[in-house]
Amino acid sequence: VKLELIRNFCIIAHIDHGKSTLADRMLEITGTVAKRDLQDQLLDGMDLERERGITIKSHPVRMHYDPGDGNTYELNLIDTPGHVDFSYEVSRSLCACEGAVLLIDATQGVQAQTVANINLAIAQNLKIIPVINKIDLPAANLELCFEQMEEVLAIPREEALKVSGKTGEGVAELLNEIIRRIPPPEESSEKGTAALIFDSQYDTFRGVVNFVRVRRGTFRRGTKIRLFSNGITSEIKEVGFFNPRMLPCDELRAGSVGYLIPNLKSPADTRIGDTVTDSDDPAASPLPGFREVRPMVFSGIYPIDTDEYDQLKASMGKLQLNDAAFVYQAESSAALGFGFRCGFLGLLHMEIVQERLRREYNMDILATYPSVIYHVYLKSGELLNVDNPVYLPDPSAIDRIEEPFIKSHIMTPTTYIGDVMNLVMSKRGVCTETASADAGHVIITAELPMHEILIDFHDKLKSMTRGYGSMDYEPAGYRAGKMVKLDILVNGEPVDAFSSIVHADFAYERGRQIAERLKEAIPPQMFQIAIQAAVGGKVIARETIRQLRKNVLAKCYGGDITRKRKLLEKQKEGKKRMKLIGQVNIPQEAFVAVLKAQEFNQ
């Protein structure tokens, strides 16, 4: 295929605006997939994606299409996720494209992620084709979409196309416009063969599989290659493209998107964003990759059965190969044994990674309460980065603790503006500006502590705006706050797995909730157990588990009260002695009960 007949593009949009459905129609119209193999969400290969109806990974596919001008064009489509947690997936997919189809749901209009994704595409200098989707629905409001496009995105309404991903109306016209508007890949004048790895996965039989966009030269089976980041050399076992399954072919040439299988067995050998070059025709410098992505949310993941530690470690290595934003390092806890401290982009990302470990790798795991990275300034002038409450130094040595803030753009119908502002303020946030998107919608810019949006901010926003509110956020630096370490003591012994760093105003509430939950989860012993929540040595909440006791008065019928009192006193002495030497074994279920409790209504 000549370079001028290739078009590389991706579909970007807010969550649920119909990206995967539109991709299904394109596959059907171009005849890429046989009629009998067609099914909804065809590109979403993971069970988890189908169940939740969301896209988690970007999916590449090659289509051939003849618009009627006598040429057959090669269209490389990449379907991308819509959630803010996966915006890194989107930005990587954009690196492999020359153009983007921006979808807008005709019933919802422009939403927060629409704005965020179009900014990513503009930053990559991509040609954008605005498309209004779902025009077959009775609730479609095209005029509102045109207004918002001109107001918020600054795109003239004449550029927009109207399609229905469900019925297929307007999709053929969209394919013609993609060929007309999106430029073909440029031929590079630089020397050396080079391809950019924009994704990868691990195959049990064939090892590492790299998804690449070839920039210069040609890769074929048997080519000797070298990776730029670590200098590892290898030989290509297979090259091919996606149809949507992997299909081997003879060669991958400049401009095309496909996969190559180097002879690498270890997941650690290859990195997403790396450049692959031909050892015999090397490139002088690596291709511009991606910005390193920094995890925002941290959580400990431990195997429920400690013997499975090595298996969990291997599973995480394979998962990290497929999910570049996931990072982990080994750690140990006195209560939970050996495990890993893991970093994620957001709460949904954390949930998905845990679910994938359970399903794809059959791991029984336990996850600790999510936290963020705090900057702890000591009185000695030293700065510590703390993502685990266990490593927080003694309060007397701390000068101040700074927590990460985010700048959030919340898009909501005007009627809910008061509720949304109250929600932001209840999470210790400040609304900095409000701007009108159109007659019925506003964009609220707010600054909030990252920790506050971890648990239920998104859910609450959705429910109070009847599902119409949407948000997108970016980091906004660190600020000092009244953060304290909340310790949970069982029988006077602190349990590290339950420690957390919280704002002083919420410490009592949080401590009380954990204590109540533990009271239900720990079985009664022969002596009384005190469960206490403490901040810096001061107990702020307490629950007591009553002891089990034998009825020592059962054999006394009538008789003097002193006899009964003597027996009761004797029992009391025994219980006191038992308490001194007694150890409380906290069952695994108690950890699960507390750590699974994501409904900490702060």
Q: Where on the chain are the PLM-derived regions?
A:
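Structural and coupling elements of P-loop NTPases
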Residues: 1-602
